[in-house]
């Protein structure tokens, strides 16, 4: 399995969509996690992996939590994510949003 270097996260009420890529930008993981499993999953990420999420109220909580674990976190402004989302992805859904956040980071 390729080593994950960057993760895009779309936060929702009950689940968190993750889109992880390797150093070449190839998708390694694209799946949903229950909110309760997200922190456990992030703890297993390789050192130096970047976790990016669209800036919103819940993102600040997760950013603080992950940074306390030594994980590099980047909050991406929503207008920047929209620009990537519009580049050929059809429709707005959690998977497309997570991929757009990953690319924008």
Task: Go through the PLM ranges and name each one.
Residues 1-105:
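Phosphate- and other anionic-substrate recognition elements at nucleic-acid/protein interfaces
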């Amino acid at each position: 399995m390729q080593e994950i270097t960057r993760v895009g996260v779309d936060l929702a009420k009950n689940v968190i969509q993750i889109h992880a890529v390797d150093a070449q930008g190839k998708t390694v993981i694209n799946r949903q996690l229950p909110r309760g499993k997200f922190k456990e999953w992030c703890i297993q990420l390789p050192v130096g992996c970047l976790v990016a999420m669209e800036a919103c109220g819940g993102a600040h909580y997760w950013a603080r939590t992950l940074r306390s674990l030594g994980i590099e976190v980047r909050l991406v402004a929503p207008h920047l994510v929209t620009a990537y989302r519009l580049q050929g992805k059809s429709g707005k859904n959690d998977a497309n949003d997570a991929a757009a956040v990953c690319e924008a980071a």
